Curated annotation (Swiss-Prot):
CDD domains: KBL_like (cd06454). Homodimer. The modification N6-(pyridoxal phosphate)lysine is found at K377. One of its GO terms (biological process) is protoporphyrinogen IX biosynthetic process. One of its GO terms (molecular function) is 5-aminolevulinate synthase activity. The gene is hem1. Substrate binds at R152, S265, K284, T492. Catalyzes the synthesis of 5-aminolevulinate (ALA) from succinyl-CoA and glycine, the first and rate-limiting step in heme biosynthesis. Residues 103-124 are annotated as: Disordered. It comes from Schizosaccharomyces pombe (strain 972 / ATCC 24843). It catalyses: succinyl-CoA + glycine + H(+) = 5-aminolevulinate + CO2 + CoA. This is 5-aminolevulinate synthase, mitochondrial.
Amino acid sequence: MERVVKLAAKHCPFVSKADPSALRRMAGAGLIRAGARCPVVRHALPVAAATGADVSRGFKSDSKQMAMEPSLDEIHLKAGVVNTGSRTCRHADAVKAAAEAATTTPVTKKHQMPKHYASDLNGVGPATTPRFDYDTFYREELDKKHRDKSYRYFNNINRLAKEYPLAHLADPNTRVEVWCSNDYLNMGGHKKIREAMHQCIETYGGGAGGTRNIAGHNQHAVRLEKSLADLHQKPAALVFGSCYVANDATLSTLGRKLPNCIFLSDEMNHASMINGIRNSRCEKIIFKHNDLVDLEAKLASLPLNRPKIIAFESVYSMSGNVAPISEICDLAKKYGAITFLDEVHAVGMYGPRGAGVAEETPGLLSRVDIITGTLAKSYGCVGGYIAASSTLVDMIRSLAPGFIFTTSLPPHVMVGALTAVEHLKVSNVEREQQRSAVRRVKQSLSEIGIPVLSNDTHIVPAMVGDAHLAKLASDSLLHDHNIYVQSINFPTVSVGTERLRITPTPAHNTEHYVQSLTNAMNDVWSKFNINRIDGWEKRGIDVGRLCKFPVLPFTTTH
């Protein structure tokens, strides 16, 4: 801009009569907008854009934001120049030489626009304003996912309530066996749950009508939260749209409100917990997975009076590992921390009434400060919740945006969830049949060398170790054997530990289904030459050990 001014000063009445300091103050959006209307000067403007000058916000520079004044019209008037509103400035010929000289100014590489900024402005808008190429950016982000084999493909799986574990694909006439659903106990298709939901819809309709604060609070929410509080032996509970939201909203709210709070988080925690801690903007310390020595060392390094939250899970969904809950509670008490326990992959399946792993040790439920769970897995519906003290629950209810500003769950969903929770408080049939199916599948796969990561839970991780191979194995099972098992890749699991995650349900506890899966897995492992048990044992990975679940007789119905 300085070069243009100097070259034009000898000829242009506008430039020669204007105050130099005023021109400098205008060397931004005001002058550029006017120049863009000039058929000569506008050709020099892309050079100014390439130098990175900030002309988009009415400021002189990036480093020192000074409002630009006076306007171009004011300077024209002071210089005695008229007809400034015409599309062609009357002094355009005089400034043409300067403009052409400016267009020849070389642009160094460091000043070139990023590739996501379009260089062809097609004459629309100020010539100095680059356009961000959104679609190119989106494509490049997706290309990264394709290159590292972490791109997610959705399979069209339509589970059939009256034929489970069967489902159909896009064609309703097809049938495939579903072996990876999180409807762990088949409660989503349970006759009692379906009938309760149908009846509720007939009476109350399909939607909630609003947030809990505005028209969305009802007797169904009250009853469900009372039942969940009773399940976990807590004074209160609060229901959310999902357990992802429950974890995120609760952790972020606690972290923002507790003064100088610090989180201690297991390195294998779910993304919802990681995100909640991140959103709290609190300090965090990651401790080694299920490592009590590492956790205690980190706790001991902190002041006793500083608020601390230990966040961990009971059953880790991709490995089946179980946390040492009692010992973590001991450390929390010793070092003045509170515990946040995610029982998402345990509620319904563990404990005498389905309250989770903590319920299996007498007296342990009362020692855990905050328990979170889901209504979308063992209970076969949708939603999440927390259970804790009345004051903590009321604080989250009153302060958590993730609870306050979202529509409540529909009445029929809460009725279905309540029916499932109450049913599993008294029925062990589903739990026993599921455990028998899990034991049979693990034993059958082990006998043919399929490397199942050892654990004593319902999770059956068949290890593959390569993202591309895992996808091929999953596709082959589906298309060649009518068996659906989703491949699990990074970032859900670490690179090199890709797997197929199998989750047997009570409906799989038949000789037909167990043998069908075993034969298909054996064929696929041979087809793609995937490592079996011995290959993983050489890497020091514990695979193939049988779980402790008891075996029941096969069921004879689906």
